[in-house]
Amino acid sequence: MSSVKIECVGSDRYRLGESPVWDEKENSLLCVDITGRKVCRWDAASGQVQALSVDAPVSSVALRKSGDYVITLGTRFAALKWKEQLVTTIAQVDRDKANNRFNDGKVDPAGRYFAGTMAEEIRPAVLERRQGSLYTLCPDHSVVKHFDQVDISNGLDWSLDHKTFFYIDSLSYSVDAFDYDLQTGKIGNRRSVYKLEKEESIPDGMCIDTEGKLWVACYDGGRVIRLDPETGKRIQTVKLPVDKTTSCCFGGKDYSEMYVTSASDGMDREWLSRQPQAGGVFKITGLGVKGIPPYPFAG
């Protein structure tokens, strides 16, 4: 077992850091600060962070095949031109739910952008239940609604054979699997593959490695856990120096580094003084496994 090393990269501290995505072309890590309403890009070579402010809570960012990015902000799917600092709405959802916003999102192997909604939180993890839905933005810019009654739509990824969709609705304290059809993007036959233990707290963002194992960031659990979706067993736990770990992705050279985002919202002064890196982005090396490159949105 190689020795695991954890370091905080960049000096920025986010209120609700989320949605880390590696941009190989730019040798950079993208992420968002949902409540801080900004999309951030950390340059791995220079260590510099560029931030782009937006007009609503921005909950996920993804690469786009034609260049630049797509984001979810408020209840909108939007295109983001980085250099021009230009945001253009592509589609809107949940028009009948003024208190909703998007949460986590990710692009599937066919280039569709999956993202889910939730009610705006009163305080972290406290909100009106079952207000959210899971959506897909297709490359032709049409939107498909998969299901509703979601509490906090969160982590998502696809199996290496593209036959299973993994998904987290945080307050179910479960990592779920669906049968997934790559051709149509349809999902069905939902089942739980892992139930979180008490000390793991709330499942948040998620990614998959090249061995088909899932990595889940545990909000208020201060850790990422590695799960085997076949056996339903936890294989590994990596603890971080902050409690509010929110999401994870692989990146860097050969996708052998893991990046973990975190939050500081909901922490009082005393808590923050104990965890000065809360809201930071962490790089984990020495895990001995690699991830797969993110898929770009095809539209």
Curated annotation (Swiss-Prot):
Cofactor details (free text): Binds 1 divalent metal cation per subunit. Most active with Zn(2+) and Mn(2+) ions. The physiological cofactor is most likely Ca(2+) or Mg(2+).
Family per record: Belongs to the SMP-30/CGR1 family.
Pfam families reported in the protein's UniProt record: SGL
UniProt cofactor(s): Zn(2+); Mn(2+); Ca(2+); Mg(2+)
Organism: Gallus gallus (Chicken)
Coiled-coil region list: none
Keyword Calcium: yes
EC number: 3.1.1.17
Name of this chain's protein: Regucalcin
Functional pathway: Cofactor biosynthesis; L-ascorbate biosynthesis via UDP-alpha-D-glucuronate pathway; L-ascorbate from UDP-alpha-D-glucuronate: step 3/4
Residues that coordinate or bind substrate: 101, 103, 121
Keywords: Ascorbate biosynthesis, Calcium, Cytoplasm, Hydrolase, Metal-binding
Top EC class of this enzyme: hydrolase
InterPro entries cross-referenced by the UniProt entry: 6-blade_b-propeller_TolB-like, Regucalcin, SGL, SMP-30
Biological role: Gluconolactonase with low activity towards other sugar lactones, including gulonolactone and galactonolactone. Catalyzes a key step in ascorbic acid (vitamin C) biosynthesis. Can also hydrolyze diisopropyl phosphorofluoridate and phenylacetate (in vitro). Calcium-binding protein. Modulates Ca(2+) signaling, and Ca(2+)-dependent cellular processes and enzyme activities.
Catalytic machinery residues: 204 (proton donor/acceptor)
Recorded name of the encoding gene: RGN
BP GO terms, sorted: intracellular calcium ion homeostasis; L-ascorbic acid biosynthetic process; positive regulation of ATP-dependent activity; regulation of calcium-mediated signaling
Transmembrane domains' residue ranges: none
Protein origin, superkingdom: Eukaryota
GO terms for MF: calcium ion binding; enzyme regulator activity; gluconolactonase activity; zinc ion binding
